[in-house]
Structure formats: C-alpha cells, structure tokens
Amino acid sequence: MPSSSPRKNIRVLFVTPEVFPLCKTGGLGDVSAALPVALRALKMDARLLLPGYPAVLAGLKSRRKVATFDLQPHFPPATLLSSRLQINESVSVPLYVIHCPALYQRTGGIYLDDTGQDWPDNAQRFGLLSKIGALLASDASPLAWVPDIVHCNDWQSGLTPAYLHFHSGKKAASLITLHNLAFQGNFPSDEVAKLGLPDESFSMHGAEFYGNLSFLKAGIYYSDHISTVSPGYAREIQQEPLGFGLQGLLAKRSDDITGIVNGIDTAIWNPATDPYLVKKYTSRNLSAKAANKLALQQTMGLENNQAIPLFGTVSRLTHQKGSDIMLQVAPMLADLPAQLALLGSGDALLEQQLAALAQAFPTKIAVRIGYDEALSHLINAGTDCFLMPSRFEPCGLNQMYSQHYGTPPVVHATGGLMDTVVDLTPETLADKSASGFHFHEMTADSFMEGIKRAINAYHNTRLWKNLQRNGMQKDFSWQASASAYQSIYSLLMQKNRPASTA
C-alpha cells in the first residue's frame, strides 16, 4: 500500500457492465458515463472498471497494460488495461478494462448470444468483473491507486461486496446502486465454489436465494450501503410486488437505503439551445414555445389549433409503461377539445391498435411507430402536456425532459415519477413547487381524471405559466445527483477505514 498523506479528494471505483458510447443496452450505460463525469466535476477521482468486450477494445484510442491476474482455477487469466473514456473533446474519465478473451472476446451481445439467450458462462463473466472490482478496492490491489469507495451497479457487479466482505485486509467501503431489481443474476448453487466464494456465503444470511446463488442478493446483503434511482422506488422495493422476492432483506436494510434521482444531460436537453426546435426558448420567453406546437401539429398531421391543449408521449409500448391504459384513454381524449401526439414502439398488437385510433381520429390523434430523436425533442417542446402512465418507474427521464421544456406532465404516482413531478394543489401552487399532475389508480378513469385536471389548468393562463416556470427552474442536472452521492461517500468513509489515504 502507498504511504499515507493527507488527501481530500474521494477516490471512487465505478464498476459497471456497460458504458456509453463504448457499449450500451439500456439506461445503465448512460448513467455509467454521466455520473462519473459529474463526480469528477466535484473534484472526486472517479474511475471506471469495465469488461473488455470487442466493442470496448475497438473503441479505445489508446491502452496500456497495468496488471495481470492469475485467478485460476476460478477464472481464466486476465490482464488489466488502462485507458480513458472520451466523453467529448474536453472531457474524459479514467477507465480500467478487463482483457480476458476467454470470457469476453466473442460475437453477440453483452449479456445475450446471437439467438437472444443468456451466455451460459455469465456467472463467470460477471464473477470476474466482481472479483477484480474487489481486488482493486482492497490492499490486494496490484495498482498504486486504490479507491475509498467501490460503487457497484446492478447484479453484474453484485459479488464485489461479497468478495470484499470475506477479505481480511484493508478494503474500500462498498455501495451498490439498484437500477432494475427485476434482473437478479441468479445461478445454480454449484457456481459458489466455481467462483471462489466461501461455503458460508451460500446461506439465507448471504447470497443464497431460493436454492440459487443470487449476485444481486449478495450485493444487497454484503454492501455497506444501497442506493436506488429515486426515493419513491427505494420505498417500493421494500414491499411486494416491486421487491421481486427481495423485499424482506431490503426492508431489514431500510436504514442503509438511499434514493437518488438520476440526472438528465442538460447539454442535449435544453430548449434554449436545442437544434431540433423550430424556435428556441427559455422560461422568460415561453411565448416562443407556440411555434414548436404549430410545427409539431404540421409534422404529425394534426389540425393547427393553438386554442386546445396538445398532449404528447414518447414511450416504449409495453404493459409496464401503461400503454394499455393509454389505448383506453386516447379515444376519450379525442372526444374532448384536445389532441394527442404519440411516438413509440414495442408490443406489436399495441402498435396496431394505436395506429388504428390515429386513423379513426386523424385530426385529434397522431401516432408514429418507431423512434425518432428529432421528433422526441419536438414532442417535448411542442406539446402542452406530457403523459406518463407507467405502472412502475424506478426513475424515468421523459418527465424530467418535459418539465425542463415547460411541458407539465400527467404521471402515475409511482417511483421516480412521484419524486420528480410535484402534483398541483393549492399548497404546492402557493409555495411554487407544483409542476404537474398525479393520478393514483392504474385505471383509465383515474388517468382521465388527471388529464381533465390538466385541461382545466391549461385554460387558466396565469396558473399554467406558473406550472411551466416551476418545472423549468428545477435542477435535474447530474451535478445534483453527484452531490447526493458525495454525501453518501463521505458518510461511508467515516464509518470505514479507507483502503488508501495516499
């Protein structure tokens, strides 16, 4: 270990299975790029650890070998490469890549093969990620740089806290962020020995989950702290059904769980600079928003009408996103002095049914199947009100985009939607926090009630402008999220002797 000397900067090793733009299957890839950048902007020394998939190795401009690992018989030989993740011309993040051709050098996806099946050796593939994450976060690290915090993400790095727990030497404090509890990394019990975990780890008070080894349960059980992507989701996962069998353990650890809302990229999502808008605007010149409404109506083939509210949604068309409720509500909305613009793709039957509604109400309902980046920006800017009827939503992004664009949303009161959208009430209007509308029952009638509340508010021009400005003035930046994580890191360091003070 390096010799100790005073140091203020917190060192964070961010262990992740994916990071944009090198490799991405979902929102975790975006978070893995954005959060470390925001942490570094707060003067923290955040670095990434990532498996060396072909796309990752191909995307590295330069690399150098900094360590070798002989972890046989549990894992094939591996080397550690040092590089940088280039975010833009002026911003990059230090990156460690695990080069292990036997586990990562193959065609197909990150988690799935070419037929859409899980790779049969995923336990070993992400066991190695977890193991090297733990080694780098302890006094067994071959590197001079040793973190104070190892920040794990979802099941793929869930064994890192377990390996650290059974390491007798100095080690970093561990945090695991739960982005999606539905994916748990459950494997047959014989993987315990294969992965080099002690027998005692495989118990109810450990990584055992209904007879299987659960990477995610291991992370939840052994980590020093747990975070989720919103305070609401942090509460919901401690009970059925969103605990997915882990609600009992999560409830026992409730004092160690913190919900922190993800940020949005305000460089990309900014109505003052957005290149996809026909007219840019800020909270001070909201009248310019009307030009985008007209452009959206023309683009989608809707009647040009500024007098009635135009509702919009950009979504995967799935049961989880409440698209079936949207299907029920759309014709009811068409009977009102209102319009709907929808962009999305997903369930084939829902796609067909929504497209049929657009044909039945051509001046009132417009549907585009697929995804269109430019149109998604124009919908956020050109609609008057955004709709998000998700059954559950750990965090959600579109409701933050829409508020940032002065488009108050109607949302189901769940997870991150409940945390980021403040329901309009006399009290929230008075304290200038109101920014949208909640509905509480997952039914068409309850959703429609929220829409009607929005329509009534829309026709009160002064009230509506207040709602718009309240939403636009909220801080949805990654800096706010990074500051919250900084507070957790500091508390964990007080409880835990840092692995390095050099």
Swiss-Prot record:
One of its GO terms (biological process) is glycogen biosynthetic process. Gene3D superfamilies: Glycogen Phosphorylase B (3.40.50.2000). ADP-alpha-D-glucose binds at K24. Pathway: Glycan biosynthesis; glycogen biosynthesis. One of its GO terms (molecular function) is alpha-1,4-glucan glucosyltransferase (ADP-glucose donor) activity. Keywords: Glycogen biosynthesis, Glycosyltransferase, Transferase. Its EC number is 2.4.1.21. It catalyses: [(1->4)-alpha-D-glucosyl](n) + ADP-alpha-D-glucose = [(1->4)-alpha-D-glucosyl](n+1) + ADP + H(+). Pfam families: Glyco_transf_5, Glycos_transf_1. Belongs to the glycosyltransferase 1 family. Bacterial/plant glycogen synthase subfamily. Synthesizes alpha-1,4-glucan chains using ADP-glucose. This is Glycogen synthase. It comes from Nitrosomonas eutropha (strain DSM 101675 / C91 / Nm57). The gene is glgA.
